[in-house]
Amino acid sequence: MFVQANSLEEIKRYFNSELSNLYTESEIKLIIKELTIKRLNISPLEFILVSRERLSESDLLFYYDALKRLRNQEPFQYILGEVWFYDLNLKIDSRALIPRPETEELVDWIKTDLKNHSQPTIMDLCSGSGCIALALKSLMLESNCSAAEYSEDALSLLRENTKRTNLSLDISKMDVLNEDDYSYLAPNSFDCWVSNPPYIPTREKSLMAPNVLKYEPLMALFVADEDPLIFYRVIAEKALVYLKKEGVLYFEINENLTVSMLTLLEGLGFVNIEVRKDLQGKDRMMKAQTVSSHHES
């Protein structure tokens, strides 16, 4: 790694020259800031003060390794090994999808809706890193939160994050498409279900960023072209059995499938269906409520 001096200023210069074809200047600035805060174990305020301080050889090796990985378009959250989600510092690596800001918006919605609910029972299906369930638990400590995930890799990360945040979740391995995997749940026992399931049709793979395809777990992203609503349909059908009357179901959705989702949920008998856009103006979240009677399982 060629730097003229062992200082952060030089690291910034070098990163900009090496990565400008892959990242914007502001992205590079953010990456360096996050890497430095983690490496030197300093606060964001202290970061402003260290730009001319001398770095050790091991520090330089750390930045060089990060640069190599960034050149290969590995997400910098995986390089850091952690991500902030709703004031929680979560461990993150290629075992699970990187939590996105849009998902924080979904948590916001649920938090607002449940604020007057005492001890709500919540289930997060296809939980991944556990970001939704853990954020909701941190916001409503009196809640009973469950998290279900099928991937063994994601489950191990979910357990690590539960321990890391000192929060309690009921965690289970569950294939949401398998009828038998719901048998341990009690009917009419949940106030809220939430899921951010795989929702990108395989045909859209070519539209995805290369770093997502190369590093993030594809089983958490893609569904078969012939049935892109499969996860939503099965989860919604089961929600009718396991949600309490007037229980609420929340989904993160594919903006191209809004109309199909509305048709699906209305057809199943859900009421008070609402769609919300994310900060980019795309349909991203959906909410539906059960009526005062339930289907039989």
What are these regions, as identified by a protein language model?
Residues 2-80:
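N-terminal auxiliary segments of SAM/dcSAM-dependent transferases
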Residues 5, 9, 22, 56-60, ...:
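Short, solvent-exposed loop/helix junctions and linker helices
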Residues 12, 32-33, 63, 76, ...:
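A general structural signal for well-ordered alpha-helical segments in protein cores
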Residues 14, 34, 62-65, 105, ...:
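Alpha-helical elements of Rossmann-like donor-binding domains used by nucleotide-donor carbohydrate transfer enzymes
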Residues 49-51, 64-141, 145-160, 287:
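SAM-dependent Rossmann-like transferase core, predominantly class I methyltransferases
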Residues 56-61, 112-121, 142, 178-188, ...:
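Short, glycine- and charge-enriched coil/turn segments that flank and shape catalytic ligand pockets
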Residues 143, 148-290:
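S-adenosylmethionine
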Residues 292-297:
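Flexible, glycine-/basic-rich loop-and-beta segments that form/coincide
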